[in-house]
Amino acid sequence: MTDTTKIDYSKTLYLPQTEFPMRAGLPQREPLFVQRWEEMNLYKKLREQAKDRPLYVLHDGPPYANGNIHIGHALNKILKDVITRSFQMRGYNSNYVPGWDCHGLPIEWKIEEKYRAAGKNKDEVPINEFRKECREFASNWIRVQTEEFKRLAILGDFENPYTTMNFHAEARIAGELLKFAASGQLYRGSKPVMWSVVERTALAEAEVEYHDIESDMIWVKFPVAGEVATENDLSGSAVVIWTTTPWTIPGNRAVSYSSRIEYGLFEITEAENDFGPRPGERLVFADKLVEECCAKAKLQFKRLRSVSAEELGKIVLDHPLKGFGGGYEFVVPMLDGDHVTDDAGTGFVHTAPSHGREDFEAWMDNARQLEARGIDPNIPFPVGDDGFYTKDAPGFGPDREGGPARVIDDNGKKGDANKVVIEQLIAADKLFARGRLKHSYPHSWRSKKPVIFRNTPQWFVYMDKNLGDGTTLRSRALKVIDETRFVPTAGQTRLRSMIEGRPDWVLSRQRAWGVPICVFVDEEGNILQDDAVNKRIMDAFEKEGADAWFADGARERFLGARAGEGWTQVRDILDVWFDSGSTHTFTLEDRPDLKWPADVYLEGSDQHRGWFHSSLLESCGTRGRAPYNAVVTHGFTMDEHGKKMSKSLGNTVTPQDVIKESGADILRLWVMTTDYWEDQRLGKSIIQTNIDAYRKLRNTIRWMLGTLAHDEGENVAYADLPELERLMLHRLTELDELVRSGYDTFDFKRIARALVDFMNVELSAFYFDIRKDALYCDAPSSIRRKAALQTVREIFVRLTTWLAPMLPFTMEEAWLDRYPQSVSIHAEQFRPTPAEWRDDVLAEKWRKVRAVRRVVTGALELERADKRIGSSLEAAPVVYIADKSLSDSLEGLDFAEICITSGISVSDAAAPEGAFTLGDVKGVAVVPERAKGEKCARSWRYTTDVGADPEFPEVSARDAAALRELQALGKL
C-alpha cells in the first residue's frame, strides 16, 4: 500500500512547464532577435525558400533621407511589413525592397545651413562639390534610418535598397524625362506656379499646405473705357472687383464675369467715408452682392437698371493704375468665366494671369479673340523670384524711387507691396473700400512660409495633349484609376478629383541637388531631339551619376559635333516628385527579384497628391497604365486627445521612446488594432492599453507552451475527438478564413480583434479553463487528455503563425521555445485547414450549450461574491430549462465538466421563485447548490468516490487510476 501521506499531489499533475518568461522584457529581448535574423540572413533564406513561388510585390514609397524616423514612418513601415510577411506566409515570394528619396530642397537647406555657419557662400562653391555634400548627407541618414527600421522588425533587402541618388536610378529618371520629351509631352512655358520666395523655387501641389492668415482685402473700381453708344449709360460708370491680394493689381489684364449672374447698374446716393465713391457715381455689381459691398464702404445706393452679360462682353475697362508709371495705358477686357460666382465679392473677378491658375486659364482661353481685338495676349512677369516687383510692374519695380516694392521677403514676411499699391489706388481715386480678412492661404510645407502665385518660365508636361492614340495623359490616368483597387475606396474618388482638376505638371525646380532636366534648347525653346546626344547623357549618368551634367565641358561632351549649333543647356533640375514617381522603372522593371506593375502601393493619405499621383502620371505618360494594381492609404497619427502632434505642444510620441520603454511589438500591436486608414491616436494611456492587451496575449501563449511541454505528439482520429475539441477545430476553420481574408483585404484590425477575442474569451475563459482538469489530472493514456493536447497544439501553431506578421518578435520567441531546431517562424506557412474540421451543425449546438453555461456561471459568480462558495468546484447547481432545444443540446455532454462544477442537475420542471436568470437567455434558470461528497486532494473536485481505491484514499477514482498509471510508468 502506498503511503499517501508522503505524496505531493501537485507533482503528480501535468502542470504547465516552460522557460518562456511571463515578463516579456521586449526592449532587451527584441534586439537579440534582430541580431539573430541578421546573422542568419533571414531575408535571403526566405528568398531562396520561396524562389519558385509566385511573386507578390509591395513597392516601398521612399521616405526622405533626412532625420530620424517619426511615428508616421513607424506606422507606415509596420503596415508594409505586415503585408509582405503575411503574403510570404501564404505561399508567395513576397519581396520587400526599401527605398529612399534623396534629392531636393530639405537636404540642400541643411548643407546651406552648414555653409552659413562656416561663413561660406553656396554660390561660390562649385556645384558638384555642393552636390557631393548633399549625397553624403543623404547617405548618412539612410544608414541611421536603416537601423531604426530594423529595430521595428522591418524585414527587407536592406543590403540592396534603392535610392533616387544611385547612379543607375539617376540615369533611369533622366531617361524617363527624355521619353516625355521625345513624345512631345514636355514643353517650356510660362505659367503661374506656386513659388516659395524663401526657398527660391516653384512648388508642386504636394509641397503646399494651407494655414489661416489675415490679409488686406480691397474693392477696386475699373472705369468703363472707350467709345460707348450714347444710349448706353454705362459710359462713365465703373465695374468693381474684390481681392485679398492687392499686390496683384499691377498684373491685372482683365475682369471676369459670369453669364449666369444677374448684374445691375447702381448709383451712389450717400457716402460717409472721406475716400471712395462719391454721391452720383455709377457702379456695376452683382445684384446679390451690392448691399453687402456698399455696407462695407458705408454707402447708400439706388438701382438704376439691369446690366446684361451681353453688354458686359462688349465693353472694355481702364486699368485702375492708368496714368501711373507710364505702363498701364492698355484697355482691360471683360471675359466670361465659369469660375466666377456671386457667393462672395462683387460678382466680378480681378483677373491677373500672372498670378492665378484660373486667371491664366481664362486669359489663355480668350487669347486668340483678344489678339484679334488688338489686345496684347502676352502675359507679363510682374514679380521676380526674390519677391520684388520687376519692370513689368511700372511704378513699383526698379523705376520706383527708393527701389522696387516687395511682396514677400527672404524670411517669408509680408513686404511693402500691398501698402504701396493701396496708396496708389487711393491717390488715383480707384479704391472703393478696404478691410482685413482671415482666410486659408498656401504655405510651403518645408519652410512653413507663405507662397505666391507668379508667372515663371518652367518646364511642364501636358495633361491634355493628344498622345497620338486619341488619349491624353489626363484621360489615361482617369481610366486607370477606375481599374485600380483602392483601400479604403474613398481614395479612388479623392485621386480622381485631383487628376480631373489639376493643371499641367510642373517639372522644373531652380535648385542644385537633383536630377537635371537634361535637354538642350534653341532660341525658341525647342528641344533638341537627337538619339546620339541622349545616349551620351544616359551613359554618362549611368557611370558617373547626374553630376556629369554639371561638370565642366558637359555641354560640349554631350552635344559632340552639334556643339557649334547654338543649343543651350538647361540648368533646372527635376521636381523630386518626378524622381519618386519614376522609382517603378529602376526597381520594379530593372530588379530581377521584383515585377512590374507592383501588386500594391501603401502610403499616407497625403500621397493622393504626392507619390500615388506622380507615379500614376509618370507611368501613364510613358507606359499607358499605373505601376500599381492596388493603392492602400493610412491616416495620420494624432495625440491621444485628437490633436496634431508638435514639439511646441510637447505631445509628440516617438517610436524610439516607445521601443525603449515598452518594445517594438507594443507599437506594432497598436498599429494592428487601429483603424489605420483614418487618423489614429497615440499617447501614454493608449500605449498602456496595448501593453495590458499584450500581457494577456503573452500569458495565453505562455500557458500553451507550458501545457505542450507534456505533449508527445500523439494524435486522436477526428471521429474520436470529444465534441469540445471538434468545436475548437471548427473555430480554427472559421478563424482561418477570417485571417486569410483580412490579410487579403488589408483589414488588420479585424484579424487582431478576432484573434485577441478568441484567446481571451474562447480559450482562456472557456476552452482552456474547462480542459485544465483533463490536461493536468487525467492519466497519461486518457483519450480526452491526448485530444486536448492535440487541439492545443493545433491552436498554438495557427495562432502563432497568424500573429507572426503582426508581432514578429514575440511569435519568434514562442516558436523557438516550442521548436528550438526551427529556422524561424517567419519561414513557416499558414497551415491548411482540413475540410472535415468545419461543422456548422456542431457550432450551432454549442451556441446553445454556451448560452445555458453563461446562466450557470452567472449564478456561480454571485455565489462567490457573497462568499457562499470559494470555487465553482464547490457547487453542483440545478439548471431549469424550459426550452427543449436548449436541453436537447446538452444530451451526451458532461455539463458539469463544461461548467467546471463538481456536479450539475438539469430539470425540465418549472424554476422556483428567486432562481437566477439572464435576460438574454430565455427559458433558463439556475438554483446554486453545494456539491456532495468529499474534496479530492489531487483535482480538488468534490465527488462521492473519494477513497474508493484504498491505496489512494484521499483522491477520487479517476485520480487514483491516474496515479496507478503514473506509478507503473515510474513517474510517481
Swiss-Prot record:
PROSITE patterns named among the record's database cross-references: AA_TRNA_LIGASE_I
Ligand binding (ATP): 647
Residue positions binding L-isoleucyl-5'-AMP: 603
Biological process annotations from GO: isoleucyl-tRNA aminoacylation
Short sequence motif 'HIGH' region: positions: 63-73
SUPFAM superfamilies listed in its UniProt record: Anticodon-binding domain of a subclass of class I aminoacyl-tRNA synthetases, Nucleotidylyl transferase, ValRS/IleRS/LeuRS editing domain
Keywords: Aminoacyl-tRNA synthetase, ATP-binding, Cytoplasm, Ligase, Nucleotide-binding, Protein biosynthesis
EC number per UniProt: 6.1.1.5
Keyword DNA damage: no
Motif ('KMSKS' region): 644-648
Secretion signal, residue range per the UniProt entry: none
GO annotation, cellular component aspect: cytosol
Domain of life of the native organism: Bacteria
Catalytic activity: tRNA(Ile) + L-isoleucine + ATP = L-isoleucyl-tRNA(Ile) + AMP + diphosphate
GO molecular function: aminoacyl-tRNA deacylase activity; ATP binding; isoleucine-tRNA ligase activity; tRNA binding
Localization annotation: Cytoplasm
Coiled coil segments of this chain: none
Its job: Catalyzes the attachment of isoleucine to tRNA(Ile). As IleRS can inadvertently accommodate and process structurally similar amino acids such as valine, to avoid such errors it has two additional distinct tRNA(Ile)-dependent editing activities. One activity is designated as 'pretransfer' editing and involves the hydrolysis of activated Val-AMP. The other activity is designated 'posttransfer' editing and involves deacylation of mischarged Val-tRNA(Ile).
Subunit-structure text: Monomer.
NCBIfam families xref list: ileS (TIGR00392)
Annotated HAMAP family: Ile_tRNA_synth_type1
Domain notes: IleRS has two distinct active sites: one for aminoacylation and one for editing. The misactivated valine is translocated from the active site to the editing site, which sterically excludes the correctly activated isoleucine. The single editing site contains two valyl binding pockets, one specific for each substrate (Val-AMP or Val-tRNA(Ile)).
Family, similarity comment: Belongs to the class-I aminoacyl-tRNA synthetase family. IleS type 1 subfamily.
Protein name: Isoleucine--tRNA ligase
Source organism per UniProt: Brucella melitensis biotype 1 (strain ATCC 23456 / CCUG 17765 / NCTC 10094 / 16M)
